[in-house]
């Protein structure tokens, strides 16, 4: 049973991961053999075992240090599954139930630990090519793992607005997609444009702008910040837990 936090409305920490691409031979996969639909098993490659060790280091060492042992919410910001896409040949299985089973094995310990601290688990839908039309397979995974639904009873939502730290705390907007660039010299351009656009839209409709925006999709981490009404605003693009594919 999840422990109720000291203040159910005040969570000071938001941990965001994305782009696990479970079901890909270069995606995240637990080291324990995973049962497939036909009764066979898949065993993680040497590369996947190395990636898994980094995943464990992140959750066992970095997260407790960064959150100072306080409750935290977890957001999976899209593309938890690899899907069947772009004529690729790197899938462990083209059966989505197999891919969902792998993602469940990856995320369930994370979700259980999050809820045990008093936090909640949220899921944002990713790319149609990976998670199905309307994010159908990511919706199934999120419901299976007990994600907190939105007002439409969607367990995997298109975006998430989250205030961190209670009343007066920073407002965060999370969405999977963001523009990309083929040039390292312009890698920050789309991210800066996304942050700027969020301020323009907020002003246009007389709404509070986000202090932070979080995006994923590009598989490369970058953070951009600028001076703002509250002193500081930032845009963060999360890295992937998948190796480079052919």
Residue ranges with predicted function:
Residues 61-72, 105-121, 207-209:
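A structural motif corresponding to the C-terminal end of an alpha-helix
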Residues 12-14, 71-74, 120, 170-172, ...:
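Structural motif
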Residues 167-246:
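Conserved beta-sheet core of the metallophosphoesterase superfamily
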Residues 1-98:
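N-terminal active-site segment of His-dependent metallophosphoesterases
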Residues 52-53, 81-155:
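Active-site neighborhood of divalent metal-dependent phosphoester bond hydrolases
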Residues 132-189:
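An acidic, phosphate/nucleotide-engaging active-site surface
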Residues 19, 79, 103, 126, ...:
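Divalent metal-coordination and catalytic microenvironments
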Residues 4-15, 161-173, 228-233:
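Beta-strand-turn-beta hairpins that frame and shape the catalytic cleft
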